[in-house]
Amino acid sequence: MNLLSQVIAFPGAEGFGKYTTGGRGGETYIVSNLNDSGVGSFREAVTQKTKRIIVFQVAGTIHLQTKLTILGDVTIAGQTAPGDGICIADQSVGLGGDNIIIRYLRFRLGDKFQRGDMINGNGGDDAFGGNRKKNIIIDHCSMSWSDDEVFSIYGGDSTTLQWNLIAEPLNYSYHYETGDKDFEKHGYGGIWGGKHLTAHHNLFAHCVSRNPRFNGARLGADEELVDFSNNVIYNWEHNSVYGGEGGKYNITNNYYRPGPSTNIKVQDRIVNPTKNEQRTFGRFYVNGNIVEGAKQVTQNNLLGVHMEGTSQDRINTIAAHPFEVINLPIENAAETFLKTIEKVGASFKRDTLDQRIIEDVIKRRGRIIDVQGGYPHGTPFDQTLTAWPTLKMENLLLDSDHDGIPNAWELLKGLDANNAKDAKYFTLSKEYSNLELYINSIVTDPKN
């Protein structure tokens, strides 16, 4: 099938991952409780090996007891949760397969299971992520409170990361590696990359570094092409965007806003290309970015490319023309800032934490934190439990046949509210199953 004739994942899907099919035409799995495991749990739904669409009949925070891996061929529709939505807490969540669509979920790890001794690997968990997977689109998710990176995804192919809020990794927490004299200060945003990855309208806030780090040709990856456009980076500390050994990158129309924690030496930094023993510097097309407080850099983005090496290295690193990608709608950095703070993250029902982060960005306040809730290092976990926002359950719609589509919507569209099989049929559209049409209709604004 010609690429241009394929069906996009959902209205508003953009970039290299936009043709991901997820669970289209598969079975319905309903998350009906907040249990760690068992019938009706989130874990049961995401670990099935069949094509499926996951919907929610519950709202609140799911406190995981062990790490969780999401198997492929799945669509997870967080926007279906009644009330204030869903948060996954306490353990890391990872992608364990290809062809995955995830929308409107929150991943807020915290340090409950990160606390331990100074042993290599302790405190090494991301809030959410996945490596070497293909056909992935992560849309309107909120991630925070990691011990390694908040959200890392690299080494795969055909990936889109859009409208995600990445904030408040735990800096002086319990991350320890061999040779350290103390737990590291490791409040990092994420490692991003892949053969073809698009990242747009994401917000990084209060991350010390890796906003993101481009993986480059390392850690099992041979080549990398990333379109990093129309994102917002706020209050980085000692590095903003960096890395990218041996890869190709468009860095265009992003908005950089230094904050209270930003080191004066990197306030005007757009990107810091690096090299290693195996690969030299990548190639970067840098244009259209706004750096607040650095008028000259905004006018000439190349002044914001900070790198070591020779003058010839710099000439080789800076590309005169953008690399060929699946183009995004044209939007300048100023427009990006306004749209992103309005709609980024799990914004269908934005929780109080995301509201605070957005207010931090607008008012240029906030700081790097060490413990969820902003408590000092070493605070007993039980004293931090109120850091997780309360997510209320409300307005559960009647669904007689338990197919994920409420009776009222089925009757409105001429479907059978007592036939569970019609959710996976393509009665109303040749492109999307009946259930997909319903879950997409919930977020009528594709940028919601």
Q: What residue ranges belong to the model's regions?
A:
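Extracellular beta-strand/beta-solenoid scaffold signature
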Residues: 88-93, 115-129, 145-153, 174-194, ...
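Bacterial Sec-dependent N-terminal signal peptides
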Residues: 1-6
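Acidic glycine-/aspartate-rich tracts in secreted/extracellular proteins
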Residues: 35-36, 59-61, 80-83, 259-262, ...
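Extracellular beta-strand-rich solenoid/capping regions of secreted or surface-exposed proteins
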Residues: 43-50, 61-77, 84-103, 109-133, ...
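Extracellular beta-rich repeat passengers
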Residues: 213-218, 222-381
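Right-handed parallel beta-helix
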Residues: 73, 78, 98-109, 132-145, ...
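Proline-centered structural pivot motif
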Residues: 391-397, 408-448
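Acidic Gly/Asp/Thr-rich repetitive segments characteristic of extracellular carbohydrate-active
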Residues: 8-54
